[in-house]
């Protein structure tokens, strides 16, 4: 038989054509790693990939790939580069190295949370280590800093990947090439000879071919000054029915068997007449994704009934399509917008069971769900598309029935839909253990991995119903030296465990450490100096022999580490108690003996908040619907103005005993002044007016113009306005899809016109924009909370708590949202969980700088919730139980006025300023006012909260503003998004609150929040 191999040098596909069989598809181009500058100046050139080297070694049905990348910085100052790279489905990172002082230093596997915390602590010191971590699905990322001025930095990423198999059993390996000018590009590929594997065919490198060298086929290519226009492909056509590989590493022998299942004798199942189509219409879906999915839809029966269920952040009402044409038309008119929530989809599927054949078209990237979900008994067949995807999660969700359109044509996919393949039932044989691959679909080619425990083993694959493969003999004496198969086994096990990473964290960590695998539970980190390895108690790689010896000699004993940790914990708790006692002392006697009248000057010349009605938003205190000030987000660098107050950042985290609050909150003169004030009822009569903000961006103006064109009368009803506004939003989205500000601004507009469902959909795009970005997720959740969308906000905040468990703010945010939902719904479960999270934020001995002040705020809020709960009439036995704590902390500090300001960016300083009715200003340099106003600790390191407290508020207008002072964050992604919550009669039965979210565009930006009027 003569085969003709043709590789198409394009970015999408390479096709293997055979004369007597259907073409076998080699997967589309896998995106190559990309590097981008972080916080560049407008006049700077971006960092770039200068050289790119790939070494690949095929072993059986797998390949190990080492990619070495040199990134260059053509600018006059050091820059940071962010490297992002999706891998093939089923691949795992198994090695990472960074050049340190010109020497490549291997990364070591560390628990993911520990690695990230260590990395971020070093970032704050201005000396970045190297970190590579699994994001979600096949997405990985790393950061490179510093890339020296007019210099370069080298990183290395190793991964192991299964070969891509076409339905006819042919195999291929695709090595992604960046489409950028390279000073040097080198490619080295090795394929073993034997086992019936034919001579491989090389593509993407012109007329270069493999050459035989000893027991392998080898190709080595080095090009200079080249711009790749195609990926490098290695095709293994006409693969034998069975391919076996055996490797030896240390004292273990690992094997892989790749087998073509026996042909099914059963007749093809006819396609049904009724279908359920689950269509992922989230914002991350691309035109290419839809085109590939539509190719399958177009092959479904025309005369059939289709139930179309569109899902994003929420599931839409099902639509019935009487023909395939109606279905296609409906899909053509379905916008791609919003986040993805598989939990919502699974809830729909369970609540609306069907016997109809169900197809799920998606990439599997669940950005809003809270974890593992289950479709119940009738699991769908997933049709997967997308460059970034989560095949492992989909296989678990769908019982293994996943069709990857990167590996199959639409017609081949239809055959699988019409006659679903059986699964591999088992593997038979003595002398083998730890077999991976059981349960996979038996189509095209089936691959299993395992460990050989004896000298020899005869292995047969069981396809069920008495169908067994021919025996494959595995011999220890045939083993080559190598780690590919052992690492591939570990990667396969990790992929199996990853969809339930929280439940399998210990095993994932053990596998990661033993086999060097990055997973949802593990990352790889590289430090530059010995003290960093010691500080974070991370063992250096054995390959750095001298460093490892110094670390071993210098490392404190386990007893010493435990003692130091206990001393740190006790010191933290002692400081917490001292500061809480100072807070209570202020509350008992809030008037200072010696008032200080300095002013910041920020209120001078500021437009009065009683200005034009377009700039005002006065709403009932019951609601949390303040309009957001949204300014387009863009990358920013440290401002020169920041250095003028750098001393504020350099202060020690722990305050000295007897600081301003503790030392000046009492005195007879304070009592005398308070006695002269007019009597006022316990609960103040107050109103709050928040300052609405119109960002006046071109996209919002276009939306408003479209709505204005409706005119008046019947056309201007709420439904028509929302429909026209959303249509124009979709037009603008094509231009601004990458801008977080766009979604925040537009969501604010839709909230403003009472189109809440559309607003929630729009804001949920933030979760799709940057996977697992806690700042972006916090912003999204805060805006949802502001709108009263607690369920959606809580799902995101639970994810943030998993991403940032070392930050008290994660648990305080969760507690606040549970608190508010619990009060609204009179939910004992929510109230109890809120109390538990307040308690965690308050009494954990956090290591984070300024965590102490978040803890104090959490104690205030915990006591307020306990008091509220005590006033409710709960069903007998259902009253939420308050967590146990020292009696010294059980004190309700109720207030006439409380204002809390929090923000979403770390290492960033935002200040709260309040101008009291008598003209005295409370701010970080004047914390205690003569009438008893109290500004809490100045948080300069990010997140807040900062508070203004007023126990007994004199009558008058209190003006509030936020000032964006500066940031020392090296990689500031954009302006700070702040949320202000204004309370009156806080902690009392008639407590009222109002929330406003806004974004501060640039350093020194001062923004009016609003007025509090006490009557």
Regions found by a protein language model. Give the residues of each.
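N-terminal, polar/Ser/Thr-rich
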Residues: 18-60
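An acidic, Ser/Thr-enriched
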Residues: 95-139, 143-148, 154-278, 382, ...
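Short beta-strand-loop
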Residues: 268, 308-332, 367-373, 391-394
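Von Willebrand factor
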Residues: 269-324, 345-346, 350-362
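VWA/integrin I-like adhesion module and closely mimicked acidic/polar interface patches used
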Residues: 333, 362-417, 475
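Alpha-solenoid helical repeat scaffolds
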Residues: 741-745, 775-779, 809-813, 852-854
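Intrinsic-disorder/low-complexity signal
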Residues: 868-1015
């Amino acid at each position: 038989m003569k085969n003709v191999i043709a590789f198409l040098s394009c970015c999408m596909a390479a096709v293997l054509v055979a004369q007597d069989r259907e073409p076998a598809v080699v997967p589309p181009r896998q995106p190559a790693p990309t590097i981008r500058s972080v916080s560049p100046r407008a006049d700077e050139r971006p960092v770039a990939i200068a050289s790119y080297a790939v070494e690949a070694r095929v072993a059986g049905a797998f390949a190990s790939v080492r990619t070495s990348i040199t990134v260059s910085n053509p600018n006059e100052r050091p820059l940071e580069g962010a490297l992002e790279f999706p891998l093939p489905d089923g691949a795992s990172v198994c090695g990472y190295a960074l050049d340190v002082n010109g020497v490549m230093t291997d990364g070591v596997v560390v628990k993911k949370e520990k690695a990230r915390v260590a990395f971020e602590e070093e970032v704050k010191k201005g000396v970045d280590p190297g970190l590579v971590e699994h994001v979600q699905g096949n997405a990985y990322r790393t950061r490179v800093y510093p890339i020296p001025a007019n210099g370069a930095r080298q990183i290395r990423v190793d991964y192991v990947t299964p070969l891509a198999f076409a339905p006819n059993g042919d195999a291929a390996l695709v090595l992604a090439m960046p489409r950028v000018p390279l000073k040097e590009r080198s490619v080295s590929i090795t394929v073993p000879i034997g086992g019936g594997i034919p001579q491989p065919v090389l593509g993407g490198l012109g007329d270069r071919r493999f050459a035989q060298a000893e027991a392998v086929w080898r190709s080595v290519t080095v090009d200079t000054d080249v711009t790749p226009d195609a990926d490098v492909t290695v095709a293994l056509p006409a693969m034998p029915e069975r391919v076996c590989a055996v490797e030896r590493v240390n004292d273990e022998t690992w094997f892989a068997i790749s087998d073509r299942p026996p042909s099914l004798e059963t007749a093809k199942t006819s396609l049904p007449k009724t279908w359920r189509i689950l269509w992922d219409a989230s914002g991350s879906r691309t035109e290419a994704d839809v085109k590939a999915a539509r190719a399958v839809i177009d092959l479904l029966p025309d005369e059939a009934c289709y139930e179309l269920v569109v899902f994003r952040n929420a599931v839409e009402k099902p639509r019935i399509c009487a023909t395939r044409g109606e279905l296609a038309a409906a899909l053509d008119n379905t916008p791609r917008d919003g986040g993805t929530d598989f939990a919502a989809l699974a809830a729909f599927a369970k609540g609306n069971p069907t016997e109809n054949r169900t197809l799920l078209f998606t990439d599997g990237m669940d950005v809003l769900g809270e974890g593992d979900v289950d479709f119940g008994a009738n699991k769908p067949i997933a049709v997967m598309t997308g460059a970034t995807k989560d095949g492992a999660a989909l296989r678990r969700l769908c019982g293994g029935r996943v069709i990857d359109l990167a590996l199959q044509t639409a017609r081949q996919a239809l055959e699988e839909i019409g006659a679903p393949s059986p699964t591999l039932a088992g593997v038979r044989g003595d002398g083998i253990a730890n077999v991976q691959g059981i349960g996979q679909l038996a189509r095209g080619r089936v691959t299993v991995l395992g460990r050989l425990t004896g000298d020899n083993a005869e292995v047969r694959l069981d396809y069920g119903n008495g169908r067994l493969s021919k025996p494959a003999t595995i011999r220890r004496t045939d083993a080559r030296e190598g780690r590919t198969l052992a690492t591939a086994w570990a990667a396969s096990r990790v992929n199996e465990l990853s969809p339930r990473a929280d439940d399998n964290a210990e095993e994932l960590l053990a596998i990661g450490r033993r086999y060097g695998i990055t997973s949802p539970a593990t990352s790889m980190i590289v430090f530059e100096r010995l003290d960093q390895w010691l500080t974070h108690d991370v063992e250096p790689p054995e390959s750095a022999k001298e460093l490892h010896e110094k670390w071993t000699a210098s490392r404190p004993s386990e007893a010493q580490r435990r003692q130091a940790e206990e001393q740190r914990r006790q010191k933290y708790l002692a400081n917490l108690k001292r500061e809480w006692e100072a807070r209570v002392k202020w509350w008992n006697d809030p008037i200072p003996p010696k008032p200080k009248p300095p002013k910041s000057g920020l209120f001078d010349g500021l437009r009065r908040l009683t200005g034009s009605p377009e700039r005002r938003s006065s709403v009932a205190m019951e609601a949390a619907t303040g309009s957001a000030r949204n300014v387009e987000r863009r990358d920013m660098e440290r401002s020169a103005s920041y250095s003028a107050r750098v001393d504020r950042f350099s202060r020690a985290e722990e305050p000295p005993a007897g600081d301003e609050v503790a030392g000046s909150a009492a005195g007879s003169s304070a009592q005398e002044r308070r006695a002269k004030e007019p009597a006022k009822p316990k609960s103040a009569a107050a109103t709050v007016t928040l300052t609405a903000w119109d960002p006046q961006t071109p996209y919002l103006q276009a939306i408003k113009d479209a709505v204005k064109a409706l005119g008046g009368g019947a056309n201007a009803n709420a439904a028509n306005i929302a429909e026209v506004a959303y249509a124009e939003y979709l037009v603008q989205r094509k231009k601004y899809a990458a801008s977080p500000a766009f979604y925040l601004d537009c969501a604010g507009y839709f909230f403003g016109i009472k189109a809440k469902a559309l607003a929630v959909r729009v804001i949920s795009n933030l979760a799709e924009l940057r996977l697992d970005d806690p700042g972006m997720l916090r912003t999204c959740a805060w805006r949802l909370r502001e709108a009263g969308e607690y369920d959606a906000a809580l799902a995101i905040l639970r994810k943030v708590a998993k991403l940032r468990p070392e930050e008290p703010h994660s648990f305080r945010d969760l507690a606040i949202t549970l608190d508010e939902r619990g009060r609204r719904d009179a939910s004992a479960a929510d109230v109890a969980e809120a109390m538990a999270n307040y308690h965690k934020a308050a009494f954990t001995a956090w290591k984070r700088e300024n965590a102490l002040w978040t803890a104090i705020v959490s104690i205030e809020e915990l006591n307020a919730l306990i008091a509220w709960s005590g006033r409710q009439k709960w069903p007998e036995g259902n009253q939420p139980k308050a967590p146990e704590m020292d009696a010294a902390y059980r004190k309700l500090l109720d207030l006439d006025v409380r204002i809390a300001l929090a923000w979403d960016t770390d290492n960033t300083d935002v200040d709260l300023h309040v101008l009291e009715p008598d003209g005295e200003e409370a701010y970080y340099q004047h914390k205690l006012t003569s009438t008893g106003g109290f500004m809490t600790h100045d948080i300069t390191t990010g997140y807040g909260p900062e508070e203004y407290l007023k126990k007994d508020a004199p009558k008058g207008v209190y003006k509030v503003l936020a000032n964006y002072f500066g940031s020392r964050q090296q990689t500031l992604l954009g302006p700070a998004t702040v949320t202000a919550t204004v309370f009156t009669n806080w902690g009392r039965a008639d407590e009222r609150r109002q929330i406003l979210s806004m974004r501060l565009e640039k350093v020194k930006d001062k923004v009016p929040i609003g007025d509090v009027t006490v009557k």
